[in-house]
Amino acid sequence: MTNGLYLDCHAGIAGDMLLSSLVDLGADVDYVHQHLLSLPLDQFSLNFAKKNKQGIQAMGLTIDFEEAHHHRKASDIFNMINESTLPNRVKERSMLIFDVIAQAEAKIHGMKIEDVHFHEVGAMDSIIDIIGSCLALEDLGIDEIKSSPVPTGNGKIKIAHGIYPIPAPATAEILKDIPLATFDVQSELTTPTGAAFIKALATHIGPLSAVSMSNIGYGCGTKDFEFPNVIRAIQYTATETTPNQVQVLECQIDDMTPETLGYFIEQVINEGALDAFYTPITMKKSRPATQLTVISSVTQAKEFEDFILKHTTSLGVRSYAVNRKILHRQFQTIHTTYGAILVKLAMKDNKIIKAKPEFEDVKNAALHSGQSFTNVYNDIQNEVRKHIQID
């Protein structure tokens, strides 16, 4: 059984909103506070209180400092975490989040990561938000994290470098390859801290799948809008082997080019199909053709039938339900000689039976190292076996 967290970021995500939602979910404030007090931080106090945001009761957070605090370099933060007595998983998760922000800032300013002088995350409240959220995850026993697409907001924002369009440069860099949601609001909805949390720890971006929801918490931001400025944190459980039913949609096509079919596959996957592929077949009178197959959830079958009829030359679609059984999958980021690599794990009976590095991470590592994909993949796979016990 996996204890998971789904973040509904319909109004964006910021560090204080996230930590507040986890406390509302049931994380022990004393556990979080005492661990934070063990770190060499400026004197501070955490004040959580319920607030009403357009009819939604949500937890809010105010952090008070006894005196003005200063920005810190990335290397200072990494050293502080490494030398701390924080739980190992809290250290790992916190480091991953800070690393995401450091890499974004380093690229934007043309610097080495260790020389990055954080503005957003070097501020003490952001350090507390990040490490505090990871402590809250640990207290709740969260094993995996998923998220909805995130909106960035519109307009302009004042940052350390002046007035800049939303999303801020660091936020935009972090959110590359992350699905975004449209929300036409003239304000910043997602901060670099919130974006980094999603980028570093979320293993899936999309709608919440069929799981058993066990608890829900709400965390609010400081801004007031005409909509509830809250993030919804949903705690769920998922079994390791999940039997379910899916819908298979098929049609046979003999008048579309491979390029057009390839484009269709990309589009239908982007629309949310579980899988899509085409197979060469031979039709009557020995005509070469293609069988197009789209797999969707049962509830979305009608939607994808219409999509196939609209975007292909087919005049009809066959549809039937099938049972499938899938192993529970979760993701873990490991540090290798090529940097942080996301690894997909397949679980059975509380044991890891398969582990595979994600293609995009291996590809990027190969491009940056100048080595062949095969060599880099084999090196990373060997390091995966050292970090992860596979039965």
UniProtKB/Swiss-Prot annotation:
InterPro entries linked: Ni_insertion
UniProt entry keywords in alphabetical sequence: Lyase, Nickel
Entry annotated with the keyword Lyase: yes
Matching Pfam families: Ni_insertion (PF01969)
GO MF assignments: lyase activity; nickel cation binding
GO terms under biological process: protein maturation
EC number, UniProt record: 4.99.1.12
Catalytically driven reaction(s): Ni(II)-pyridinium-3,5-bisthiocarboxylate mononucleotide = pyridinium-3,5-bisthiocarboxylate mononucleotide + Ni(2+)
Keyword Membrane part of the UniProt annotation: no
Enzyme class at the top of the EC tree: lyase
Role: Involved in the biosynthesis of a nickel-pincer cofactor ((SCS)Ni(II) pincer complex). Binds Ni(2+), and functions in nickel delivery to pyridinium-3,5-bisthiocarboxylic acid mononucleotide (P2TMN), to form the mature cofactor. Is thus probably required for the activation of nickel-pincer cofactor-dependent enzymes.
Family: Belongs to the LarC family.
HAMAP family, per database record: LarC
NCBIfam families xref list: nickel pincer cofactor biosynthesis protein LarC
Protein name from the UniProt record: Pyridinium-3,5-bisthiocarboxylic acid mononucleotide nickel insertion protein
